[in-house]
């Protein structure tokens, strides 16, 4: 089946995805942005130095600032931040082809409702199947053609495999899944845990503490995913463990850098500057966990630190003096 692919969102991740799919050469790809001036520059210069400095964009990649440019696309990737996806669905929904599959590429939870992004998009776009792409992949690595593997999940395996085949390339490999819950929650919760890893680094309390956070954070993630109807095996895969290791250790991670700033005692506003998905997801995840009676002490601590309800020193003491239990 011949596919036509549209990527909405001309930030770093959307541009990188559009570029790597275009380089694969199997499907025509168009990158759709909201800023006509930026789109004109991308088309003329084949560079996006503001977010991907020095990386040339393929000549085969098309560009547009018009919403109707997605008409005719059989696969449409939503690559804007999580909290902007509902508005994007309303803006671009009228131009979707009848049989188009929508793929959310954000890693977050809808802040006002606590819904997963696939649930929100199905509510906004009820006539279209919705999938999710997530996992350990930085935009710069993808755009540079460095080997990257991620997960793509749909409601059925047939659709997931079709999407994986259409989007994968020589340096960008997707693994198909039918666990949309697990893939999405892994992507959202690892951002919160990456902030915790950053706090550890900024505070200077050692790599042993970071390793403990990753391991115990993964246990929290697994409890939450299973309680929400996802699969524990997904948590141990690319969208869970893989993404957590990447964002909890690499300074390319906005969430890690945000945590480092907190750990150093710097004032860091998650709503200013670089968008930090984990800062937005922490309170939502903590609230949902409490409603489900799930123990998530690391997530709770991160939420309380960001909200100013808990000092870092007190959070560390609370975590280290919890009742002894089995692993």
UniProtKB/Swiss-Prot annotation:
It comes from the Bacteria. The lineage of its organism: Bacteria, Pseudomonadati, Pseudomonadota, Alphaproteobacteria, Hyphomicrobiales. GO terms for molecular function: glycerol-3-phosphate dehydrogenase [NAD(P)+] activity; NAD binding. Keywords: Cytoplasm, Lipid biosynthesis, Lipid metabolism, NAD, NADP, Nucleotide-binding, Oxidoreductase, Phospholipid biosynthesis, Phospholipid metabolism. The active site is at 190 (proton acceptor). It catalyses: sn-glycerol 3-phosphate + NAD(+) = dihydroxyacetone phosphate + NADH + H(+); sn-glycerol 3-phosphate + NADP(+) = dihydroxyacetone phosphate + NADPH + H(+). It comes from Rhizobium etli (strain CIAT 652). One of its GO terms (cellular component) is cytosol. PANTHER family: GLYCEROL-3-PHOSPHATE DEHYDROGENASE, GLYCEROL-3-PHOSPHATE DEHYDROGENASE [NAD(+)] 2, CHLOROPLASTIC. NADPH binds at residues 13, 34, 107, 139, 254, 276-277. Coiled coil: none annotated. The gene is gpsA. Sn-glycerol 3-phosphate binds at residues 107, 135, 190, 243, 253-255. Its EC number is 1.1.1.94. It is found in: Cytoplasm. Catalyzes the reduction of the glycolytic intermediate dihydroxyacetone phosphate (DHAP) to sn-glycerol 3-phosphate (G3P), the key precursor for phospholipid synthesis. This is Glycerol-3-phosphate dehydrogenase [NAD(P)+]. It is an enzyme of class 1 (oxidoreductase). GO terms for biological process: carbohydrate metabolic process; glycerol-3-phosphate biosynthetic process; glycerol-3-phosphate catabolic process; glycerophospholipid metabolic process; phospholipid biosynthetic process. The keyword Transmembrane helix does not apply. Pathway: Membrane lipid metabolism; glycerophospholipid metabolism. The keyword Membrane does not apply.
């Amino acid at each position: 089946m011949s596919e036509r692919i549209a990527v909405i969102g001309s930030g770093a991740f959307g541009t990188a995805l559009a570029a790597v799919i275009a380089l694969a050469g199997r499907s025509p790809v168009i990158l759709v942005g909201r800023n006509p001036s930026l789109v004109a520059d991308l088309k003329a210069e084949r560079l996006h130095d503001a977010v991907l400095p020095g990386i040339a964009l393929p000549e085969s990649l098309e560009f547009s600032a018009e919403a109707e440019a997605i008409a005719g696309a059989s696969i449409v990737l939503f690559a804007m931040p999580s909290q902007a996806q509902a508005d994007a669905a309303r803006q671009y929904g009228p131009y979707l082809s009848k049989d188009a599959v929508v793929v959310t590429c954000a890693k977050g939870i809808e802040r006002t409702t606590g819904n997963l992004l696939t649930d929100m998009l199905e509510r906004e776009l009820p006539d279209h199947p919705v999938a999710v792409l997530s996992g350990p992949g930085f935009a710069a690595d993808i755009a540079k053609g460095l080997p990257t593997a991620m997960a793509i999940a749909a409601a059925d395996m047939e659709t997931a495999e079709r999407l994986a085949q259409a989007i994968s390339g020589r340096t960008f490999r997707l693994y198909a899944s039918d666990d949309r819950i697990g893939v999405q929650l892994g992507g959202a919760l690892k951002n919160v845990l990456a902030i915790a890893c950053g706090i550890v680094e900024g505070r200077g309390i050692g790599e042993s503490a970071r390793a403990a956070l990753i391991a115990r954070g993964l246990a929290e993630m697994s409890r939450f995913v299973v309680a929400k109807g996802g699969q524990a095996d997904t948590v141990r895969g690319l969208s869970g463990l893989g993404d957590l290791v990447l964002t909890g250790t690499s300074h390319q991670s906005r969430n890690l850098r945000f945590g480092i700033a907190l750990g150093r005692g710097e004032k860091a506003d998650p709503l200013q500057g670089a968008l930090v998905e984990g800062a937005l997801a922490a309170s939502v995840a903590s609230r949902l966990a409490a409603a489900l009676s799930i123990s998530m002490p690391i997530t709770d601590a991160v939420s309380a630190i960001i909200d100013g309800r808990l000092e870092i020193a007190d959070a560390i003491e609370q975590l280290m003096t919890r009742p002894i239990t089995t692993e």
